[in-house]
C-alpha cells in the first residue's frame, strides 16, 4: 500500500478508534464485584489482542496487494465496518448481563467476519502475487490465510446456543472458545513468523 494512501489513513483511523473506544468502554461498565472487574478486563484483553492481530495482518496484506481493485476496496471497507462496531458490542458484553446471550452471539459473528474478511484479503494477495512471491512468502501467506479461515469458523461455531449455556470454571464455554481461538491463532502466527 502506498504511504499515506486514503485507505491506509482510514484503516489506521478505524482500528485506532476501535481500540480507544474499547478501552473507554471499561469506564462505563460500573463494576460492582471483583468478578465484574476481572471479567471486563478479560473481555477487553481478548478484544484488544484480536484487533491488534487483525490490524497487523491487514497492514501486512494491504502493503502487498493492489488495493485499487474494487473487490479489495469493498472487502477492506466491510472489514472496517466490523472493526468499528466491535467496541459497541464489547461495551454491551461488559455492561449488560441480560443482553449477554444476544451480545455474545453478535460479538462472535463480528469476530468471525473480521477474521474471514482478513482471510479473503490474504487469498486475493496470494492469487494476485503467486508468480512474484518467494516460496517462503507464499507459505507464510497461505498459512496465515488458512489460520484466519479456521479462526473465523471457530468463532461461528461458538454461536451454537449450548456453548452459551455450558460453563467451565464459572465461565461460558462460548468465551472459552474465543480464548482458545485466540491462543490457536497466536501460536500458529508465531510459528509461521519464525520459519
Predicted regions, residues:
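Multi-pass alpha-helical transmembrane bundle typical of ion/small-solute transporters
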Residues: 1-195
Amino acid at each position: 500500500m502506498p504511504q499515506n494512501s486514503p485507505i491506509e489513513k482510514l484503516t489506521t483511523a478505524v482500528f485506532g478508534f476501535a481500540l480507544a473506544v474499547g478501552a473507554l468502554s471499561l469506564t462505563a461498565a460500573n463494576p460492582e464485584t471483583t468478578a465484574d472487574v476481572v471479567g471486563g478486563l478479560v473481555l477487553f484483553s481478548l478484544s484488544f489482542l484480536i484487533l491488534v492481530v487483525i490490524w497487523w495482518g491487514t497492514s501486512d496484506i494491504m502493503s502487498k496487494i493492489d488495493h485499487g481493485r474494487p473487490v479489495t476496496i469493498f472487502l477492506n471497507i466491510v472489514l472496517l465496518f466490523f472493526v468499528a462496531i466491535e467496541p459497541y458490542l464489547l461495551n454491551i458484553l461488559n455492561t449488560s448481563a441480560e443482553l449477554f446471550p444476544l451480545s455474545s452471539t453478535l460479538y462472535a459473528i463480528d469476530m468471525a467476519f473480521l477474521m474471514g474478511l482478513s482471510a479473503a484479503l490474504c487469498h486475493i494477495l496470494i492469487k494476485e502475487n503467486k508468480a512474484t512471491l518467494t516460496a517462503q512468502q507464499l507459505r507464510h501467506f497461505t498459512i496465515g490465510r488458512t489460520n484466519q479461515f479456521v479462526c473465523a469458523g471457530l468463532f461461528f461455531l461458538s454461536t451454537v446456543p449450548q456453548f452459551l449455556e455450558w460453563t467451565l470454571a464459572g465461565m461460558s464455554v462460548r468465551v472459552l472458545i474465543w480464548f482458545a481461538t485466540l491462543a490457536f491463532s497466536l501460536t500458529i502466527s508465531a510459528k509461521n513468523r519464525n520459519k
